[in-house]
Amino acid sequence: MEYNEYEPEPQYVEDDDDEEITQEDAWAVISAYFEEKGLVRQQLDSFDEFIQNTMQEIVDESADIEIRPESQHNPGHQSDFAETIYKISFGQIYLSKPMMTESDGETATLFPKAARLRNLTYSAPLYVDVTKRVIKKGHDGEEVTETQDFTKVFIGKVPIMLRSSYCTLFQNSEKDLTELGECPYDQGGYFIINGSEKVLIAQEKMSTNHVYVFKKRQPNKYAYVGEVRSMAENQNRPPSTMFVRMLARASAKGGSSGQYIRCTLPYIRTEIPIIIVFRALGFVADKDILEHICYDFADTQMMELLRPSLEEAFVIQNQLVALDYIGKRGATVGVTKEKRIKYARDILQKEMLPHVGIGEHCETKKAYYFGYIIHRLLLCALGRRPEDDRDHYGNKRLDLAGPLLGGLFRMLFRKLTRDVRSYVQKCVDNGKEVNLQFAIKAKTITSGLKYSLATGNWGQANAAGTRAGVSQVLNRLTYASTLSHLRRLNSPIGREGKLAKPRQLHNSQWGMMCPAETPEGQACGLVKNLALMVYITVGSAAYPILEFLEEWGTENFEEISPSVIPQATKIFVNGMWVGVHRDPDMLVKTLRRLRRRVDVNTEVGVVRDIRLKELRIYTDYGRCSRPLFIVDNQKLLIKKRDIYALQQRESAEEDGWHHLVAKGFIEYIDTEEEETTMISMTISDLVQARLRPEEAYTENYTHCEIHPSLILGVCASIIPFPDHNQSPRNTYQSAMGKQAMGIYVTNYQFRMDTLAYVLYYPQKPLVTTRAMEHLHFRQLPAGINAIVAISCYSGYNQEDSVIMNQSSIDRGFFRSLFFRSYRDEEKKMGTLVKEDFGRPDRGSTMGMRHGSYDKLDDDGLAPPGTRVSGEDVIIGKTTPISQDEAQGQSSRYTRRDHSISLRHSETGMVDQVLLTTNADGLRFVKVRVRSVRIPQIGDKFSSRHGQKGTVGMTYTQEDMPWTIEGVTPDIIVNPHAIPSRMTIGQLIECIMGKVAAHMGKEGDATPFTDVTVDNISKALHKCGYQMRGFERMYNGHTGRPLTAMIFLGPTYYQRLKHMVDDKIHSRGRGPVQILTRQPAEGRSRDGGLRFGEMERDCMIAHGAAHFLKERLFDQSDAYRVHVCEVCGLIAIANLKKNSFECRGCKNKTDIVQVYIPYACKLLFQELMSMAIAPRMLTKHLKSAKGRQ
C-alpha cells in the first residue's frame, strides 16, 4: 500500500467496520500472539535455526581434506603413478528423530518421559554423506580419479531441545501429550542430558562490526578510543578487534606531542600511525588519504586535527616502505624484505577488518571503512557528537541456544576432521586400505556436546576461554520459576566488579527486559529476564537487502568521488558500509513498506540516523525486538473488524498472529529502531492526540504500544497492582514467586524429580492480572486466597511474623507434599565384579550402617507404602570383596555394604520405586519418598507484594478475632509491615478481593489501567461493606469488641519452600573434620554451630575469659601435646612405656605437657615443614611461678 493514498477523510460518522479499537481489544491480539508463539519461542526458533541451517553451513564451509602420501623411496621399484592424492569431502547432513540404542543393540524412538526416568540423553543421531576421491597423476600428466561415495555415515548424536521441530512431541495435541505422560502446559525449550533437564541461558555480548567511540578518563595515555570488533558474517574465527586511538595532548615528558592518531593491527606488536596504514593500502598522496577521512576539505577543524598524524608519517612516502614498516613490527624477526612485505600484505588483506572483505580487491572498501572509523573518532574529539554508550541495548546481542551450540559444533567438527586427516594419513603412509567407518570417531561430537550441556562449561574440557554456567539445571519448583528460567539471560561480567553502570536499568531496555525481575545481591542487574512479548531475532541473510539497495540507487565506492559523501547518506548493512544514497527518505519508506508486506524479512531492522547522516540496516541474530501497532495519520491501522475476525476464528492455526503481521497492522521494532520511532503509550492517548492536537505530545505518532503491562516479565506479571508498590518490593516478589509451592507440572506423579513440592489445595487468585492467563497461572496456581486481617493481636506477629488460624490448618490450609528421590545403580567394578541390589546379611557383610535394614524386601528395595524415618536403609546394595582384600580382614566377610539410607533429618513414606536399566544396560533404581508438611511455627509465607513473614503463633478458631458475620481470619499480619514498605498494592488487592468474592467474579489488577481505589471502594460499598474494607471485630479471648476497626479481606498468599523442618538443627557432640579435628560444618553432616570472630569480640568485650576459653578451645579442638623445655619444640612421648624424649636436645627429663588447640598444633607442624621453628617456651613461666 502506498503512503500517499490517504487523503484526510471528511468528518462523518465512522462506519462500524472502521471503528477504532479499544484497549480491551488489544488483549485479543495478545492472545493470538501467545497462542502462536508460546512463552519460550526464542529458545525454540534459535535451536531450529541451528538444526536446519547452521549445522549444514558448518559442514559445507569445512575445506576438503587433502592427503598426499610421503614418498617412500624404493630404489628398484618404479611406481605406476607420479603421485596419488586422496581427497575427502563432506556433503549433505541428515538428522533423524531422537533414538536410543539398548545395550543389546536394538534401536527405538526415544520419548522425553523415558529419557528422564532412565537417565538417558534425549538426542538424535546425525549422519553425513562423505565422498572419497583418489586422484592418481600419471608420469605423462594425465589424471585418473576414482570416486567412492559413502552415504549417511554416522558422525555423532546431537541433543534435541524439547518441543523443537525435531522433537517427538512437536505439534502434538493435548490428548497425545497426556498419553505420552507429558504435561500439556510444559513449554519445552530445554534439553535432557543424562536424565536431568538443562536450560541454555542466553548470553549477552557487545555487537560486532559496530564502531564505538569512547572517551578515556584522564589521566590516560589516550584521549579517545574508537573500536570495532570485526567478524565476518559466515566465518568461524574469533572476532578481530581493531582500536584507533588518539593520544592525549600532553605526553609523559611534559612536552606537547601533538594529537597523533594510531591504530592496532592484529599480530602486530606496536601501534601503527594511521597514515602509514593508508599508504600500505595503496593510498599515497596526502590528498587521497584526507579524502577518505574528512570527505570535505572545507572542514578546517578536522583537517587541523589530522596535521600531526600526517607530519608523523612524513618519512614514509610509498606503499612498499609502508608495508615494510608494518612487516618489521610483525611477529617474525629477521626475514627478508620480500617476506616482510608479503606478511604485511596478508595481514592487511585477511586480518584487518575481515567483515569488509578478505578477498583480493577490497583496498578501497577497507580504506573507506578505516577512514570512517577515524572520522567518527574525530567527530567525538571535536565534541560534535557524544561518545557511544556501552550499555545501550541496541549495542548488545544475545547468544541463544542456536549460536552457542553452533560455536561448539563448529569446534567439534573441526576436531573430527583433524582426526580423520591424521587417520587417513597414517593409513596411506602404511599402505593400508582407507576405511572411513573407522576414520570417523562419532564420539567426538557426541561426548563434546554432552559434556558442555551437562557441566555448563562452554568449550573444550579444561581449556582456556571457557565460560561457566551457560547451561543450568532447569528450576522445577513452581511453574512460574520454570518459565522464568527459560527466559533468563546473563551478562558475562565478573560478579566481583562493583561497577554500577552495567547493572542499572537502561532506558533502552523498556519493553525488552523486565524492570523488576533480577536477583538481589552480587548478580543484581547482570542476570535479567525477558519481558513478555520480546522476540529475539534468529538472523537472516543480508544478500536480499544488498540486492535491493543496488536496485534502488545505492552508489558504491567505485562510482563516487569522496566529495559527495558529506551531502549523501551513508548506508550500512550489519555494520558494513556498502555505499551512499542521495534520497534516504524514499529508501527508508520503501524498505519499511516492503517489511510490512513481508517482502523483506520481518525481523530486519531499519535505523535512520539523521544527525550522523547514516542509514543502518540490520539482519543479524540476537537483537531484541518487540511487536507494536503501526499508526498512520494518528490512527491505528488495525480496526475493529480485524479484531472481530480474530475472535471469530475456528482454530488457532488459521490466520492468527502472523496474519496480522503480514497484513501490516503490526511490526517488530528492535531496540535501535525504537530510538527513531514515536510510540503512543495507550490507544486512548492516541485518540486524545487526535481530538485535542494542541495538547498532544506530537502530531506524528508512528507506533502504539500493544499494552504497557507487557514490559514486565513472567514473575512480575503475577503481581497485582505492581504500579502501586515501591519498586524493590516488586523485585523481592519476583524472587519469592519462584519459591512458592503449587503444582509445578501436571504429570508430577510420573516424574522422579530430586526435590518436588506440591500444595494440597492450590487456588487461582481472586485478583488476577490479564497476563496470567497466558502464563497458565490459573491452571497451575501457587497459593491460596486467605482471609487476612491487618492488626496487632497478642503480639505474636511482631517483626514480620504472622498469626495463623490453627483450625484452618487442620482443615488443610496450606498443607503440602514434599517428594525426594534417591537413586542408585549397579556399577561395574571391572570385568566380572559388579554391585548387587539385595538385602545385606549382617553375618557376611562388612561396614554395615547402624540404621535399620528391616524395611527392605529381598530385592534390596523398600516397597511403596513403607513408613521410613531417619537413617533407615531404603536401597540395599553390596559388592563382593576380592580375595586378597579378604585375607587381611577376618575371613567371615564376603561382601561390603554400599547401601543408601534416608537423610537423617527426614521421615516419610516410600511413594514409588522404579527399577529399570540405564543406557549401559545396568540395573538402576529410583526411590521416591513422600512426606506431608503441615504449616507450623517457623514456616515462611508471603503475599504477592514482597511481604514475607514466618508463622509466629497459631491460635485455634475460638481464640481468633471474629466479625459480626462470624468470619475469622486465617492470617493476621502486623500493621507495621505496611507504612515503611509502601506496598499499597496489597491493600488494594485486599479490597478488590472482597468485591470479587462478593460478586463472584475475578478482579482485574493489571497494571497501568484506569482502575482506581475510589471505583473499588464504591463497588465494595454497594456490596454492603464499609467502603475502605474496615470491619468491627470482637476479641476471641474475651468476646468484647476491639476498639479499632480492622482492615480485613481475602489476599492471595504463597507458601515458600523454606520450612522449619528442613532447617532445624542442633548438636552436642558429634563428628569432627579429619584435618583440623574441629566440629564438622553444616546440618547435613550434623555439624557444630560456629562461634565466629564477631561473637569472639563480644565475649572479649564482656571480659568473659573463661567462657571464651570454653567455646574456642575446650568445646572445639583441645589437644594434649608434650613439649621439650630446652628447645620448645614438640617432643616424642610414649605413654604406654611412660618414656619421653627430645632427640634434638638429647633431653629425656625436662619435658612438660601442655594443652593447645589441635588447629594450632597443625599450624606449628606446617610451619616446621617450611623450616620455621615455632617454639613453645614454658621455662620462664615455670620460673615465674617458682618465684611467687
Curated annotation (Swiss-Prot):
It comes from the Eukaryota. It comes from Arabidopsis thaliana (Mouse-ear cress). The keyword Zinc applies. Keywords: DNA-directed RNA polymerase, Magnesium, Metal-binding, Nucleotidyltransferase, Nucleus, Transcription, Transferase, Zinc, Zinc-finger. This is DNA-directed RNA polymerase II subunit 2. Pfam families: RNA_pol_Rpb2_1 (PF04563), RNA_pol_Rpb2_2 (PF04561), RNA_pol_Rpb2_3 (PF04565), RNA_pol_Rpb2_4 (PF04566), RNA_pol_Rpb2_5 (PF04567), RNA_pol_Rpb2_6 (PF00562), RNA_pol_Rpb2_7 (PF04560). DNA-dependent RNA polymerase catalyzes the transcription of DNA into RNA using the four ribonucleoside triphosphates as substrates. Second largest component of RNA polymerase II which synthesizes mRNA precursors and many functional non-coding RNAs. Proposed to contribute to the polymerase catalytic activity and forms the polymerase active center together with the largest subunit. Pol II is the central component of the basal RNA polymerase II transcription machinery. It is composed of mobile elements that move relative to each other. The binding of ribonucleoside triphosphate to the RNA polymerase II transcribing complex probably involves a two-step mechanism. The initial binding seems to occur at the entry (E) site and involves a magnesium ion coordinated by three conserved aspartate residues of the two largest RNA Pol II subunits. Mg(2+) binds at residue 800. GO terms for biological process: DNA-templated transcription; miRNA processing. The gene is NRPB2. Residues 852-871, 877-897 are annotated as: Disordered. Disruption phenotype: Defect in seed production due to female gametophyte developmental arrest. GO terms for cellular component: mitochondrion; plasmodesma; plastid; RNA polymerase II, core complex.
